[in-house]
Amino acid sequence: MKFSLFALLFVVVSCVDVGTQTRDAFILAHKQPLSTYAVENMDFVLEYGLYNVGDKPAQKVTIDDRHSFPTNSFDIVKGLLFVHFEQIPAGSNVTHSVVIRPRAFGFFNYTAAQVTYYTDNENHHVTLTNTPGEGYIYRQREYDRRFAPKYTYFLVFFLIVAPTTLGSFLLFQQSKARFPNVIKKKST
């Protein structure tokens, strides 16, 4: 009896809660670097994702990340750091990518981007993306030394190994040329 009464109470409370949940637009935002390493004078790709998890569309949505990447430290190769979307429907998402190029090396603090939107014509909301935090921008020379392909090492290895391999092959060919009859007699 207690269990059935408790179950009935739970069902009634759940139904009342579901019936009263009509949420306005609610934007979840993230900022994510797609490049593995930030290197001076090389492209660095960032992706912004906006997800409307509300029941209504978000109007006049803007992403503003101009303060994170000042033009004296970064070149904008492709994309914009200030983007405007007229509407993001309920239950949908939008992504935006930007390609920037760091001008200098060293530590850099990647701050959050500001996202503003309206749930209807009056309710103005401001939210922030996640913050990737502090990152390191490698020097081009240091990046090449650590991560670039080591073609010179392979070339040196080939120059060291080639004489012994080539010498063995030439000795085999001379030996084979001296005894052609032995090979023919064994095969017949």
UniProtKB/Swiss-Prot annotation:
Transmembrane segments: 152-172
Keyword flag Endoplasmic reticulum: yes
Cytoplasmic topological domain residue ranges: 173-188
Sites carrying sugar chains: 93, 109
Domain of life per record: Eukaryota
Record flagged with keyword Transmembrane: yes
Side Lumenal, residues: 16-151
Cellular localisation: Endoplasmic reticulum membrane
Signal peptide boundaries: 1-15
Keywords: Endoplasmic reticulum, Glycoprotein, Membrane, Signal, Transmembrane, Transmembrane helix
Family, as annotated: Belongs to the TRAP-beta family.
Subunit structure, as described in the record: Heterotetramer of TRAP-alpha, TRAP-beta, TRAP-delta and TRAP-gamma.
Protein name: Translocon-associated protein subunit beta
